[in-house]
Amino acid sequence: METKKYGLGTTAIHAGTLKNLYGTLAMPIYQTSTFIFDSAEQGGRRFALEEAGYIYTRLGNPTTTVLENKIAALEEGEAAVATSSGMGAISSTLWTVLKAGDHVVTDKTLYGCTFALMCHGLTRFGIEVTFVDTSNLDEVKNAMKKNTRVVYLETPANPNLKIVDLEALSKLAHTNPNTLVIVDNTFATPYMQKPLKLGADIVVHSVTKYINGHGDVIAGLVITNKELADQIRFIGLKDMTGAVLGPQDAYYIIRGMKTFEIRMERHCKNAKKVVEFLNKHPKIERVYYPGLETHPGHEIAKKQMKDFGAMISFELKGGFEAGKTLLNNLKLCSLAVSLGDTETLIQHPASMTHSPYTKEEREAAGITDGLVRLSVGLENVEDIIADLEQGLEKI
């Protein structure tokens, strides 16, 4: 399929499909650990990479290949590598491109496990990590060194949905020809933003979220050029992490991607109406959403994103107790971590995900006592708003 001729929705449905023996419409699940060779000579050629074909599911599987082809087409990259989680994608990538003595510049605002990998994981193996605000190009410029191998960031970032100018950042980072720009595009997805087209070298995803969209799979994906993808597959994934995605999970994601575009349209449409409600509510101090003109990254988001997404953070005036009260009185919204599901998910970081931390530690990470994170789902938006309204009345 010539994906460039088609729209995003068509690409998500049709890209990367492989013909199979029986001509099935749905992609078969090739539930096998290993593959049979016609001869010893063929086995030798495949291990020597002289002949295309499958060897062992840790190295590749037809069902997983279809998923990889689809996301590569959506992100407009040359190739992709599927992993068993978003952290598997991030770890497999970093363990491929980094070595002792290298330097990483990354953002202060990161997904918690990514932050832990940067702060406690990489540094154990002789890799230096500098944390900056990547939306401030002067900070990035001042942090970079001759041995800076990676600039890593999320945009929009968690929890305040900070926006980074990817085109400007990539241009700055590439003044060092050895530096790779890696972007976690989980929040935006290729529906809204394509970092490779804006100058990034590698894109990573937690496919658990919007791309699968149904809350029933843990998976990750890496998208980049063919050379780097091969290195990540045969070094970082095969030898370092072993974070291989199984064909059953790959099938679920392929199925989920068939509704990717229409789901994202509904997510974004619902979120705008929820933001409008929250922004006017007297018990809310502040709403973080890149679609608001008051958001510091609004103009950049308009420039590099097709839409503003379905993630919202807001601060309650009543602080810690107000956050708990709101969540404990909701009837429709689900109290759960993660995001990008059909259901609306809500969490209060101070009393949930970040409860082991002190107040000072939370605030250093941008998490105030009254901060609430909302992943707007696909329910009728009037029902989402009504549930939030009745919950807020209890504060």
UniProtKB/Swiss-Prot annotation:
Cofactors demanded by this protein: pyridoxal 5'-phosphate
Keyword set, alphabetical order: Antibiotic resistance, Lyase, Pyridoxal phosphate
Primary enzyme class: lyase
GO MF annotations in UniProt: homocysteine desulfhydrase activity; methionine gamma-lyase activity; pyridoxal phosphate binding
Residues the entry annotates as binding substrate: Y111, R373
SUPFAM superfamilies associated with the record: PLP-dependent transferases (SSF53383)
EC number: 4.4.1.11, 4.4.1.2
GO cellular component: cytoplasm
Residue numbers of N6-(pyridoxal phosphate)lysine PTMs: K209
Pfam families associated with the record: Cys_Met_Meta_PP (PF01053)
Annotated pyridoxal 5'-phosphate binding sites: Y56, T57, R58, G86, M87, S206, V207, T208
GO biological process assignments: response to antibiotic; transsulfuration
Family per record: Belongs to the trans-sulfuration enzymes family. L-methionine gamma-lyase subfamily.
Family matches, as PANTHER family: CYSTATHIONINE GAMMA-LYASE, TRANS-SULFURATION ENZYME FAMILY MEMBER
Oligomer and partners: Homotetramer.
Other facts noted in the record for this chain: F.nucleatum strain ATCC 10953 is able to grow in medium containing 1 mM 3CA.
Protein name: L-methionine gamma-lyase
Source species: Fusobacterium nucleatum subsp. polymorphum
